[in-house]
Amino acid sequence: MKGKIPKIRNQANKVKRTPRYMEFPVTYEVYHVESGDTLWTIAKSFEIPVQQLMNLNKLSSDRIYPGQIIKIRER
């Protein structure tokens, strides 16, 4: 190995970068639909607009079914 210079990896230039943002899981308060429930009665009982329930649950109509789980709001 005469005349050869061994290569040394330079670790000093490697900087660990932290992410600029962190993702947190979103949790929701939910409601289990019972027989006789409507979006209107659910919205009224939680004091939120029907349209907010529809948007949050990606509903295209106001039809809901017993046993369905409806997101109410983020926790």
UniProtKB/Swiss-Prot annotation:
PROSITE patterns given in the database record:
LYSM
Q: Matching Pfam families, A to Z? A: LysM
CDD domains, alphabetized: LysM
What highest taxon heads this organism's lineage?
Bacteria
Q: Which residues are in the LysM domain?
A: 29-72
Q: Which SMART domains match?
A: LysM
Fetch the Gene3D superfamilies from UniProt: LysM domain
Name of the featured protein: Uncharacterized protein YkzQ
What organism, scientifically named, is this protein from? Bacillus subtilis (strain 168)
